[in-house]
Design a protein with these regions (language model features):
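Von Willebrand factor type A / integrin I
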Residues: 10-14, 28-142
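Acidic beta-strand-to-loop metal/phosphate-binding motif
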Residues: 17-23
């Protein structure tokens, strides 16, 4: 995320909408500094990509990964599932606080669905079913 923000800082000089689509894993002090510098002269929007299984983890065995390492977890124990949900809620609060300090709204999308469709829905953009319909919409704008 920090590398992406460094690049955004070079590109977004003034009055630009910077959209961060991320799981926000690994937000640190450097992330906060970079984002604050960007948001000083630009608008920001955060789109959190989340895993619905973290909201309500199922009982049973589950393989989890941080992108590099994998771990098999036995989620039959209710206390472990509750702890995972608590950790997820605390993580959500940190992300919300991070974006609130930047005056950046937060939207959420799931890693289970089509990202483009979810973003269009969140932004209130109706899906276009075919090319003819899209062309007729563009004619209306002229």
């Amino acid at each position: 995320l920090n590398r992406a923000l460094e690049k955004a800082m070079r590109l977004a000089k003034h009055d630009v909408l910077v959209v961060i689509i991320s799981d926000f894993f690994g937000v640190d002090e450097q992330t906060s500094k970079l984002a604050a510098r960007i948001s000083a002269h630009n608008d920001m929007l955060g789109i959190l990509v989340h895993d619905p299984m973290r909201v309500d983890p199922p009982a049973g065995r589950l393989r989890v990964s941080d992108g590099q390492n994998q771990l098999d977890m036995d989620l039959d124990e209710r206390r472990l599932r509750e702890r995972l949900v608590t950790d997820y809620r605390e993580e959500q609060e940190r992300i919300t606080h991070f974006l609130r300090r930047l005056s950046a709204p937060l939207l959420m999308i799931s890693n289970e669905g089509d990202v483009v469709k979810q973003v269009r829905r969140l932004l209130g953009v109706a899906p276009v079913s075919n090319m003819d319909e899209m062309l007729s919409l563009s004619d209306m704008q002229d």
